Amino acid sequence: MRHRKSGRHLSRTSSHRKAMFQNMAVSLFEHELIKTTLPKAKELRRVAEPLITLAKEDSVANRRLAFDRTRSKEIVGKLFNDLGKRYATRQGGYLRILKCGFRAGDNAPMAYVELVDRPIGGSVEAAE
């Protein structure tokens, strides 16, 4: 029985899932808008939001934790210099998930994941 088991397997091994969500989080923080399937978007929220909460308090220990979870110096810099300051007063809910129809090949439900209060310069086509 799967009672009280949280998280989705997404037909992947645990190492594949970890690597996939690490890469998706880096892409999300880099572009601030990505397009993915709805179940992946809902799971990505569980990975990305704690990183922004971590970035709200700038310390060497927090930077090392963020680097351990993203493996990207550029993204750690953006998290602590830009996103941590942008969401300093927000208590959570840093991501918005917008349903955007179904994928043509297999009819999978798709969604946009974007950072709340992001600058309105980015285009939706860049996310695809």
Swiss-Prot record:
One of its GO terms (biological process) is translation. Keywords: Ribonucleoprotein, Ribosomal protein. PROSITE patterns: RIBOSOMAL_L17. GO terms for cellular component: cytosolic large ribosomal subunit. GO terms for molecular function: structural constituent of ribosome. It comes from the Bacteria. The keyword Ribosomal protein applies. It holds the Pfam family Ribosomal_L17. Belongs to the bacterial ribosomal protein bL17 family. Part of the 50S ribosomal subunit. Contacts protein L32. This is Large ribosomal subunit protein bL17. It comes from Pseudomonas syringae pv. syringae (strain B728a). The gene is rplQ.
